[in-house]
Amino acid sequence: MQWEVVIGLEIHTQLTTRSKIFSGSSTQFGSEPNTQASLIDLGMPGVLPVLNQEAVRMAVMFGLAIDAEIGQHNVFARKNYFYPDLPKGYQISQMELPIVGKGHLDIALEDGTVKRVGITRAHLEEDAGKSLHEEFSGATGIDLNRAGTPLLEIVSEPDMRSAKEAVAYVKAIHALVRYLGICDGNMAEGSLRCDCNVSIRPKGQAEFGTRCEIKNVNSFRFIEKAINSEIQRQIDLIEDGGKVIQQTRLYDPNKDETRPMRSKEEANDYRYFPDPDLLPVVIEDSFLNDVRATLPELPPQKRERFQSAFGLSAYDANVLATSREQADYFEKVASIGGDAKLAANWVMVELGSLLNKQNLDIEDSPVSAEQLGGMLQRIKDNTISGKIAKVVFEAMANGEGSADEIIEKCGLKQVTDTGAISAVLDEMLAANAEQVEQYRAADEAKRGKMFGFFVGQAMKASKGKANPQQVNELLKSKLEG
């Protein structure tokens, strides 16, 4: 039987506010346990939550970016459940009236096509604390620093049909929230976490199968592996005559399998009701307009502009627009260097390789956009060749100065004097007289391969400084003369 996979995702994004959603406690990551939890975060009697307006602004900004309905009258609700790291015994969230309603996001797939994924809603809520199992023997520690940190939970429609589509969607959300500046996207620190809802059904069937939720997956690679593992588990189970039970599961990367955590709850299990300590949130039109005016150029528009204004391919535009920092870096290099396609190649290939080797983000690049743009100017005006440029780039990465300083100090200027190049070629051809005779006696097909040998010898003789184009032209003339 052929199976169709149905995937919907819930993405929890930690908002980059300096204080928590209902208290003035700091949201800074990495502090000593339980040093950033106020009486409000601890749920002490007699204290009242106060909504952080900046969290509201960030949620509205996200809603506008996905062309969603904004809930101008939205309500906070209590989600009631017991867990050791939830001090109040309930979580303040939103249920019936969320701040962001239906919207959509267009995602770029590996084959170059674009798919629209529906977004059901996005709502504000507070994060729970954190249980610490490894640090204690025979016990569990509780760190409440994270309790009360503002989250925007983004709930997709079940529109994805493969693990790769799901990863593409998460990457698009990751890029968007970073572009907007509302989440740092640091998955290792838990700033962006994903719950994956997975089910299968016979191909052509309209009714959904029974879904299982994989909780708290925190890397793109694990999202793909967890979903594929769960798909195979469900297929094997049904084909062996079993039945999928609705449940919450965890992904074990060491065994590459999902394992049951608990039976899957429904909304009524949480006994949602409006939080009596918080008034309904009313968003005025003027507030909406103010937020709309601060929206930056978003990834889809940036990709489109990179193709139309710079003549880049869809692939190159997509790669360069992955993050706001990378897009800004590329544009600065292109404006200084004067050649967008050359800039794109250097940013994606040479710079990308350098950053990967050193495990750096582009904002921490040892080669600034100004330095790289300056070096591309020297390629454009024939001061250096593309081959010598790699030597200059490596020197810049090692902190040896600007391109001009390195070229001058190391004597790397390209030789463009026709007479000087001609003399080098004459000497090289004389030293390879036998190969010259073979070339002249060969047919056209063999000459092509042999010509490359002479070019290599010429560049070697000039220590890579001879202008390659002039070498080709003069060499052809001498060999066929």
UniProtKB/Swiss-Prot annotation:
It comes from the Bacteria. Its EC number is 6.3.5.-. Keywords: ATP-binding, Ligase, Nucleotide-binding, Protein biosynthesis. It is an enzyme of class 6 (ligase). PROSITE patterns: GATB (PS01234). Belongs to the GatB/GatE family. GatB subfamily. Allows the formation of correctly charged Asn-tRNA(Asn) or Gln-tRNA(Gln) through the transamidation of misacylated Asp-tRNA(Asn) or Glu-tRNA(Gln) in organisms which lack either or both of asparaginyl-tRNA or glutaminyl-tRNA synthetases. The reaction takes place in the presence of glutamine and ATP through an activated phospho-Asp-tRNA(Asn) or phospho-Glu-tRNA(Gln). The keyword Protease does not apply. Pfam families: GatB_N, GatB_Yqey. It comes from Pseudomonas fluorescens (strain Pf0-1). Heterotrimer of A, B and C subunits. It catalyses: L-glutamyl-tRNA(Gln) + L-glutamine + ATP + H2O = L-glutaminyl-tRNA(Gln) + L-glutamate + ADP + phosphate + H(+); L-aspartyl-tRNA(Asn) + L-glutamine + ATP + H2O = L-asparaginyl-tRNA(Asn) + L-glutamate + ADP + phosphate + 2 H(+). The keyword Iron does not apply. GO terms for molecular function: asparaginyl-tRNA synthase (glutamine-hydrolyzing) activity; ATP binding; glutaminyl-tRNA synthase (glutamine-hydrolyzing) activity. This is Aspartyl/glutamyl-tRNA(Asn/Gln) amidotransferase subunit B. GO terms for biological process: glutaminyl-tRNAGln biosynthesis via transamidation; translation. InterPro entries: Asn/Gln-tRNA_amidoTrfase_suB/E (IPR017959), Asn/Gln-tRNA_Trfase_suB/E_cat (IPR006075), Asn/Gln_amidotransferase (IPR018027), Asn/Gln_tRNA_amidoTrase-B-like (IPR003789), GatB (IPR004413), GatB_C_1 (IPR042114), GatB_Yqey_C_2 (IPR023168), Gln-tRNA_amidoTrfase_suB_CS (IPR017958).
